[in-house]
Design a protein with these regions (language model features):
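Nucleotidyltransferase catalytic core that binds NTPs
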Residues: 1-164
Length: 164
């Protein structure tokens, strides 16, 4: 929150390295583990669609109304309801550190492959990560890629600084 070029570049790398026919940006109303989002759902959907409109394989969707939830487990169950999709759940190494706090995180890892991209300053911390120790290498795929030193929180700070 907000989407940025780092998200887009990671998506392009994932499409190529995982040979994906489609990649979905599942934009949620609110992350249950974070404070209220800076931009509302409608604005984040607009920004995400605008950012990804030149990459045919990226689709931007919100499942909150369909699943009546913002929880990842409900989105994944909804996606798998009528077909045997192979789902890759993509996250940065910063999110993997707190993955054990997510609702039904072990079930998420059983329903899909967790794909992790490096974030500056986080890879060494994963040595003691609960999710890494618990799930092991068969459930988590680390993808090497160029590290993009950009963060949504820095973008929000700069936005506020120049907004006023």
């Amino acid at each position: 929150d907000p989407p940025h070029n780092g998200h887009l570049e990671i998506s392009k790398v994932a499409i190529k390295k995982l040979k994906l026919s489609e990649l979905i940006w599942a934009v949620t109303k609110k992350n249950p583990l974070k404070k209220d989002p800076y931009f509302n759902l409608k604005k984040r959907l607009f920004l995400s669609k605008n950012m990804t409109n030149r990459v045919n394989k990226i689709k931007v969707k919100s499942y909150d109304k369909l699943t009546k939830s913002s929880r990842t487990i409900n989105v994944i169950k909804y996606m798998k309801r009528n077909n045997d999709l192979k789902i890759y759940f993509i996250m940065g190494s910063d999110n993997l550190l707190n993955f054990h706090k997510w609702s039904e995180w072990r079930k998420i890892a059983n329903l899909c492959k967790i794909v992790v991209f490096p974030r500056t300053g986080y890879m060494k911390k994963l040595i003691n990560c609960i999710a890494v120790k618990s799930l092991g290498a068969e459930k988590i795929l680390f993808i090497r890629s160029k590290r993009i030193n950009i963060s949504s929180s820095k973008i929000r700070k700069n936005y506020l600084k120049y907004k006023y």
